[in-house]
Amino acid sequence: MGISELADFLEQNFSKKTYTELSANQNKSLIQSSKCEAYDFDEITEYIFPQNKPSSADAILLDKNRIYFIEFKSGFHRKMSRTNFDRAQCRCEKIDDICDDYAKLMKRHLENIESELKANLFQKTAESRWTLEYHLLPEAYKNKTYPDLQIFYIIVTDKVKEDPIDAMGQIMDDLANIHNEDNFYERMEQSVKHLYCESRYRKKAFYDKVEVYSVQDFETFFLN
């Protein structure tokens, strides 16, 4: 038994959408132009839970015996962030100098924004897996035992979409195998992996693998 029962269930009850549609947020899509398609997992979750819908990934993709959840997340790409914070931007005209109190508040605000985005992602990874395991798979396979499937969670962010300098820095970090707290993708991956890929007993928890992609990398590996 493979993944065919789940594929048939989704095909009978839902229509696929392009990644341009799936990545849209407030009339702006992370994936600008793509004819590749996947299922809308938000729609599937709403079908299962007409009321009190849990949070969910944007898309679900089936490939052989693998299930990919895909989350398109904007908000990480900002002119000022926790890692590029510049105190000079907190200059006060009244005192003609940098306002230390304002600088501290601004840095804390930027840290809170990133923490909130991460918390939202953590909730989606957990509740998406719960919906799949205890509701979607039992619905698709009825009373049958469903196969041992590999479950992946892919996070696509706008971190370097319009910032070639940041993108080049990331490429250089990767080539040099640099691991530090300023490497955005590594910090994100390690955070999610710690919670959902490896339990405290060094055993698989919710996912076989979690990866964080820039838009460019996602387009290269998934859409070509």
Question: At which residue positions do the language-model features occur?
Answer:
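Conserved catalytic cores of phosphodiester-cleaving nucleases, focusing on short active-site segments
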Residues: 59-61, 66-74, 128
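Acidic (Asp/Glu-rich) sequence patches and key acidic residues
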Residues: 56, 66-69, 79-91
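Basic, amphipathic N-terminal segments that precede the first structured/catalytic domain
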Residues: 1-57, 219-224
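Short, flexible/disordered intra-domain loops and linkers
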Residues: 85, 110-117, 165-176
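Short, low-complexity, polybasic intrinsically disordered segments
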Residues: 146-219, 223
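Short, flexible loop/turn elements at secondary-structure junctions
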Residues: 26, 30, 43-45, 63, ...
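Acidic, metal/cofactor-coordinating or nucleic-acid-engaging core segments within structured domains
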Residues: 87-146
